[in-house]
């Protein structure tokens, strides 16, 4: 799958670096001057995590993003998978 969260499907995004200089007009300046845009990538913060599944009585390894991991710790793995319409059997 590459750099992709196995539960939510988050993956690398692409965008621009936009350098800005000068004080904004709102703050009393002459306006911001935008330089040349440079392409860049926004990579997902992925973590390989081992989760224990009490229903199966064993552990499973899942590659998840950090934001997904926070949600799993709040809700629990089975509730979060159900919310994202995934099944535990998909990760075995």
Curated annotation (Swiss-Prot):
Record organism: Borrelia turicatae (strain 91E135)
GO molecular function: structural constituent of ribosome
Assigned protein family: Belongs to the bacterial ribosomal protein bL28 family.
Superkingdom of the organism of origin: Bacteria
Segments of this protein annotated with the region Disordered: 1-34
Biological process according to GO: translation
Protein name per UniProt: Large ribosomal subunit protein bL28
Keywords linked to the UniProt accession: Ribonucleoprotein, Ribosomal protein
InterPro entries in alphabetical order: Ribosomal_bL28, Ribosomal_bL28/bL31-like_sf, Ribosomal_bL28_bact-type, Ribosomal_bL28_sf
GO CC annotations on file: ribonucleoprotein complex; ribosome
């Amino acid at each position: 799958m590459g750099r992709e969260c196995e539960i939510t499907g988050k993956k690398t995004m692409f965008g621009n670096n936009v350098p800005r200089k000068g004080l904004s007009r709102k703050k009393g300046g002459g306006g911001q001057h935008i330089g040349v845009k440079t392409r860049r990538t926004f990579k997902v913060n992925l973590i390989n995590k081992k989760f224990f599944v009490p229903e199966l009585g064993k552990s499973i390894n899942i590659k998840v993003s950090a934001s997904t991991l926070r949600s799993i710790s709040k809700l629990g793995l089975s509730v979060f998978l159900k919310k994202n319409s995934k099944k535990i059997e998909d990760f075995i």
